[in-house]
């Protein structure tokens, strides 16, 4: 394969696609470069399909090499470990727009591997990996209805920006990744700070316009370096099987799919399917897979026709109606906050825990190292759908759903300086029939308010769907699991009464117009407000106090140059305070000190010890001092821990003193008065001026 290179101008910089130099034995390999960031993207697809394969085994493995940023991994073996949370999330971003563009019936094992091999401090490699992955498939012989491209959209001072730099992202009120083809938006993922539905719509179509040059440059590369696409055959279902299944099952199945409860509906459908398989086994020997596929296709067609044409949903609702909602809080007495959110047959048990800076999660990646102060973890155990399976670790779906909920809630959390807690929220899905991630958002909002976390507003989430049959189009609010599986769009929107905080969208078909998206966003807003009203019946504002089991964090401020004094040599002073009081103490370089303890008295004791270490002498004030060292010319005394001053021999008594030891001995307690503090900070003290006086009583 000859080396080929194409370029385009994007956002004031040059984006480059190269092929034919690296990874030449892959079916497709492209290096995408932008600024100092480079991503090597490879695509390989098996030449033979596994026997009995019934789904498309696509795997995306995105990896950030630490050498790309001139770093060495911090792990014990100094190697990159398994996929980080960030890498897992980027894998999903790449997978979701690519998967629907492979031909129907293509079930050959396919692996996409974007590898970050160089990274600068301004250009995030995630959207570049999305472009490079599409380009690698496009130039390969793998069948593909692409290319697609992706951009990140930010907004600074009201101006939309495509692929903002990391500096610009820090100032932006939105962070959205949009992926699309030449004609349509396919995938959206991101977070915003309370923007309106119209502003969101404008951002989406701004992004679609921005990706066009990235589509063009891929097509240019395909033109000069693309391979001829391989041919493959799709096994077709025997038409006789399709006809017989419809004849035997259509009437009964039409009624079964209208059963409103999920388990009863599934049982009825399974019973019909079993009977059909048994009935047709003799006439269509060894065609069980065809019979099952024909039955599934029939079920899909019946449900879609029922919703799109008859305007009747599986559970009897109209397109706008939200399932019945119940909200309970404070169920778990020892969790710092808890909620049980139930919407129809979807239920989330959500708990919140408050911790200190020691509980922050260290996030070490190729571009930076951060400490995460808010985490939301989503768990989807098999029992929530009445199944069994081995679960050891959260899967990609669970990590993705948890991050969507985390982004949704993060916008309403208090500033860390005002509320210096580390927060962890866990959502355990107890029942699932669609929209479990949105139930997690609602439950998390309730649990945090129950915990007394001063969130600015409640947050709710809703999943929207779309079914398009010819000219019949229906946008559905609060979709069921079957409506998600059998529909054409999954559009999750979260937000407050003020605006949108996060969204996630996957579109499976072409031709979803701006008007349809506008309708979906408006319908989602109406649904979100309804859900917020239901949540307000349980709690309207954060509790005024934290759980008695939560740590109390008190923040005090000392001068930055006093931090060393508080810490002490080798950490001696701060360790002593921790051992004496049992408090957790976190000291910032700017002099901010957080003291955490569930015991209020212990916290007060720690504060007093720190104040003793950092207090400064005041001219004219009396101190009870300890004699530390006797000299011929006077005595050095400690007026408080770490601070000493000199009592000159002439200041020991009103009469003349010949020897210091006539008045003082080392270890004596003596009342002194501060006379002066010179420019070097030396403290001049007097015993003579303190005679006849006493310390004021502590109030």
Curated annotation (Swiss-Prot):
UniProt family annotation: Belongs to the polyribonucleotide nucleotidyltransferase family.
Cofactor(s) needed: Mg(2+)
Enzyme class: transferase
Highest taxon, organism lineage: Bacteria
Function (record text): Involved in mRNA degradation. Catalyzes the phosphorolysis of single-stranded polyribonucleotides processively in the 3'- to 5'-direction.
Binding-site positions, Mg(2+): 484, 490
Matches recorded under InterPro entries: ExoRNase_PH_dom1, ExoRNase_PH_dom2, ExoRNase_PH_dom2_sf, KH_dom, KH_dom_type_1, KH_dom_type_1_sf, NA-bd_OB-fold, PNPase
Name of the protein: Polyribonucleotide nucleotidyltransferase
GO biological process, one term: RNA processing
Catalytic activity: RNA(n+1) + phosphate = RNA(n) + a ribonucleoside 5'-diphosphate
Major site of localization recorded for this protein: cytoplasm
Gene3D superfamilies linked to this entry: GHMP Kinase, N-terminal domain, K Homology domain, type 1, Nucleic acid-binding proteins
């Amino acid at each position: 394969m000859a080396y080929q290179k194409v370029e385009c101008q994007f956002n004031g910089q040059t984006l480059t696609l190269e092929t034919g130099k690296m990874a030449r034995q892959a079916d497709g390999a492209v290096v995408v470069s932008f600024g100092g960031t480079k991503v090597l993207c490879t695509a390989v697809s098996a030449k033979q399909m596994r026997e009995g394969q019934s789904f498309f085994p696509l795997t995306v493995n995105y990896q950030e090499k630490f050498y790309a940023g001139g770093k060495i991994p911090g792990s014990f073996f100094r190697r990159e470990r398994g996929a980080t949370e960030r890498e897992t999330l980027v894998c999903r971003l790449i997978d979701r727009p690519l998967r629907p563009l492979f031909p129907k019936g293509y079930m050959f094992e396919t692996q996409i591997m974007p590898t970050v091999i160089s990274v600068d401090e301004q250009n995030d490699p995630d959207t570049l990996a999305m472009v490079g992955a599409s380009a690698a498939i496009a130039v390969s012989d793998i069948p593909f209805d692409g290319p697609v491209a992706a951009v990140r959209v930010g907004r600074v001072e009201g101006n939309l920006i495509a692929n903002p730099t990391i500096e610009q992202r820090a100032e932006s009120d939105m962070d959205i990744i949009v992926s699309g083809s030449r004609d349509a938006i396919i995938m959206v993922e991101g977070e915003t700070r309370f923007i309106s539905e119209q502003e969101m719509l404008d951002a989406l179509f701004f992004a679609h316009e921005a990706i066009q040059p990235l589509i063009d440059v891929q097509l240019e590369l395909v033109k000069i370096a693309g391979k001829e696409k391989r041919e493959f055959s799709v096994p077709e279902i025997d038409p006789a099987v399709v006809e017989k299944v419809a004849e035997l099952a259509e009437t009964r199945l039409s009624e079964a799919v209208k059963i409103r409860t999920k388990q009863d509906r599934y049982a009825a459908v399974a019973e019909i399917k079993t009977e059909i398989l048994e009935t047709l086994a003799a006439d269509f020997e060894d065609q069980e897979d065809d019979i099952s596929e024909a039955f599934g296709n029939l079920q899909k067609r019946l449900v879609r026709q029922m919703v799109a044409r008859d305007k009747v949903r599986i559970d009897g609702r109209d397109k706008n109606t939200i399932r019945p909602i119940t909200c309970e809080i404070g169920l778990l007495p020892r969790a710092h906050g808890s909620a049980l959110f139930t919407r129809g047959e979807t239920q989330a048990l959500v708990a919140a825990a408050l911790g200190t800076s020691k509980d922050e999660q260290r996030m070490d990646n190729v571009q930076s190292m951060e400490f995460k102060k808010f985490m939301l973890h989503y768990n989807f155990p098999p029992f929530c759908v009445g199944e069994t399976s081995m679960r050891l670790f959260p899967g990609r779906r669970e990590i993705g759903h948890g991050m969507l909920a985390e982004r949704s809630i993060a916008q309403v959390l208090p500033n860390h300086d005002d509320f210096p807690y580390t927060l962890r929220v866990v959502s355990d899905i107890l029942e699932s029939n669609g929209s479990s991630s949105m139930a997690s958002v609602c439950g998390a909002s309730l649990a945090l308010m129950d915990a007394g976390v001063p969130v600015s507003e409640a947050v709710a989430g809703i999943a929207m769907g779309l079914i398009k049959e010819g000219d019949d189009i229906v946008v559905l609010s609060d979709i069921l699991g079957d409506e998600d599986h059998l529909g054409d769009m999954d559009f999750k929107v979260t937000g407050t009464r003020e605006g949108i905080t996060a969204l996630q969208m996957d579109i499976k078909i072409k031709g979803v117009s701006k008007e349809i998206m506008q309708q979906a966003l408006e319908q989602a807003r109406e649904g979100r407000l309804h859900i917020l009203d239901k949540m307000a019946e349980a709690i309207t504002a954060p509790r005024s106090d934290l759980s008695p089991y939560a740590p109390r964090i008190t923040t005090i401020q000392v001068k930055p140059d006093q931090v060393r004094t508080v810490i002490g040599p080798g950490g001696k002073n701060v360790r002593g305070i921790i051992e004496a009081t049992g408090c957790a103490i976190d000291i910032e370089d700017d002099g901010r000190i957080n003291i955490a303890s569930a015991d209020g008295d212990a916290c007060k004791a720690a504060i007093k010890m720190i104040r003793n270490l950092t207090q400064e002498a005041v001219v004219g004030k009396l101190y009870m001092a300890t004699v530390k060292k006797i000299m011929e010319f006077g005595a050095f005394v400690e007026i408080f821990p770490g601070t000493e001053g000199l009592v000159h021999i002439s200041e020991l008594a009103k009469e003349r003193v010949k020897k210091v030891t006539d008045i003082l001995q080392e270890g004596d307690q003596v009342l002194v008065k501060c006379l002066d503090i010179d420019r070097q900070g030396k403290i001049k003290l007097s015993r003579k001026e303190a005679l006849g006086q006493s310390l004021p009583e502590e109030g």
